[in-house]
Regions:
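Acceptor-binding helix/loop patch of EC 2.4 sugar-transfer enzymes
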Residues: 113-136, 176-221
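Carbohydrate-associated surface elements
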Residues: 236, 258
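Conserved donor-binding/catalytic core segment of Leloir-type glycosyltransferases
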Residues: 268-296
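Short alpha-helical donor nucleotide-sugar binding micro-motif in glycosyltransferases
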Residues: 337-338, 345-350
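Aromatic "clamp/platform" in nucleotide-sugar-dependent glycosyltransferases that forms part
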Residues: 358
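Conserved acidic donor-binding segment of nucleotide-sugar-dependent glycosyltransferases
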Residues: 393-400, 409-414
């Protein structure tokens, strides 16, 4: 049970260093803007931007997507961008610099005790990572922040602004104290993940392990409360960041993510029977997959439909067992770690896309499906209503009967599916653009730069 719990938490965490740089562009470039805008300077003046991301998986979760597309949009606006990232590293364009700060990544290993190396005795940070992971903790955000501070001390990079992507580490305090303007993005407070995991725990032992894993939240609360410039990707995430982290409401600006509408576009592909599609970025309670499985089993009583799952359920996990109990395994088609182009092809075969999450800070899967012209059934959890709007069907979280009714109704009404598909595509193209997101983000950069020397 212990190992399974650790694996689920790691997959769901929206959670002596060697340094190597690949294609670094910003750190070595001459500064083209000072720490505060001089009179008459343009807000469009190019900036040297440092994006921090402690984990940037390009295939799972939203943080790697955020880093990839925001860095691209910033460079297209004329700014220079370096991404400093721990493993897994992001997929970046060639004109975006990547500075690798690998940690020990002990939490990725099942045999944590066996990962001990004698070199840890000479490296206090590596020893901390190993001990924390060995005792059920998640050391990555804190350790990444320490390595970032060390990197800045060793290399003295010339950045105009540092933008943290949800590490919310103590290292941000240090960077601000040393004169670096800092902005941080909170996709959603991870307290939401902790609460969902605790609610689904089987016994007090598992709850104890969960609380140990999420100890890093104490650090993130402390850091967010002290930051004067915070971005959230939805109004819902803003409210929860204030409520759960105690953030100053006046310090937060909402900047919605964009969607790559050149990549995610309608493609009509042949299908043999009705197809329902969903993505599973992590097999954790927060994603609500069990409610979709129950709903799909209900729908199968009336419609010979197929469920397409992009992602995978943990072997022997709750969802894996539920598939067997419901007898729907022969109607489920799974795909894991596929290319974006392949994902768009799969959307082209789908009649309905479903996002059953209990909570999403934004809801990239909903936006991507809408961009592909696929009608969406989603819950009202978190930022999903802000993405879906009137272009889909919204139901309450944790309600498989409501999900089943909405799916069944759309599968039986082709005209409504077409209307919603067209409306969804139009909504995403018009309202969720990465260039717009980058421009709004740059406004916050300039505010941070202007106020850094004023004790903000």
């Amino acid at each position: 049970m212990v190992t399974g719990t650790f694996r689920r938490l790691l997959r769901g965490s929206s959670i002596t260093s060697s340094v190597s740089a690949v294609g670094s562009t910003a750190a070595g470039a001459p500064a083209e803007s000072e720490l505060s805008l001089e009179a008459g300077e343009s807000a469009d003046e190019p900036l040297n931007v440092c994006l921090l991301s402690y984990r940037s998986n390009p295939y799972s979760g939203g943080q790697g997507v955020y880093v990839k597309y925001l860095s691209r949009a910033l460079t297209e606006l004329g700014h220079s961008v370096d991404v400093i990232s721990g493993k897994p590293y992001p997929d970046l364009d060639n004109d975006v610099g990547l500075i690798r700060l690998p940690g020990e990544n002990v939490v990725d290993e099942l045999d944590r005790l066996g990962q001990f190396e004698l070199s840890y005795l000479r490296d206090p940070l590596a020893l901390y990572e190993w001990l924390s992971a060995l005792t059920g903790g998640f050391p990555d955000p804190y350790a990444f922040g320490r390595r970032v501070v060390d990197y800045f001390e060793d290399h003295q990079p010339d950045y105009d602004v540092v933008h943290d992507n949800q590490s919310l580490c103590h290292g941000l305090h240090t960077l601000r104290e040393r004169g670096h303007p800092v902005v941080a993005t909170v996709h959603h407070p991870i307290t939401v993940d902790q609460d969902a995991a605790l609610a689904a725990a089987d016994d007090w032992k598992e709850r104890l392990l969960i609380r140990r894993w999420y100890r890093f939240l104490e650090m993130q609360r402390d850091v967010v409360q002290d930051l004067p410039h915070v971005l959230t990707v939805s109004e819902s995430a803003r409210r929860h960041t204030v409520a759960d982290f105690g953030a100053d409401p006046d310090a937060i600006r909402v900047v919605h993510n964009g969607i790559d509408t050149d990549l995610f576009e309608p493609r009509d592909r042949p299908r043999d029977r009705p197809r329902v599609m969903t993505t599973v970025s992590a097999d954790v309670p927060l994603k609500g997959a069990r409610y979709l499985l129950e709903a799909f089993a209900d729908v199968r009583g009336d419609v010979d439909a197929e469920l397409v799952v992009v992602g995978e359920f943990d072997d022997g996990g709750d969802c894996d067992r539920l598939v067997s109990e419901l007898g729907i395994g022969d109607a489920i088609e799974t795909h894991s770690e596929i290319s974006y182009d392949r994902m768009v092809d799969l959307y082209g075969t789908a009649d309905v896309a479903v996002v059953p999450s209990l909570y999403e800070g934004f809801g990239l899967p909903a936006g991507e499906a809408l961009a592909c012209g696929v009608p969406v059934v989603a819950t009202t959890g978190g930022g999903l209503p802000e993405v879906v709007g009137d272009a889909g069907v919204l139901v309450e979280p944790e309600d498989p009967a409501a999900l089943a009714d909405a799916i069944r109704e759309l599968l039986g009404d082709g005209a409504r599916r077409r209307r919603l598909g067209e409306r969804g595509r139009r909504r995403i193209v018009e309202e969720f653009d990465w260039e717009r997101a980058a421009r709004e983000t740059v406004r916050t950069y300039h505010t941070a730069i202007e106020t850094q020397g004023q004790g903000a």
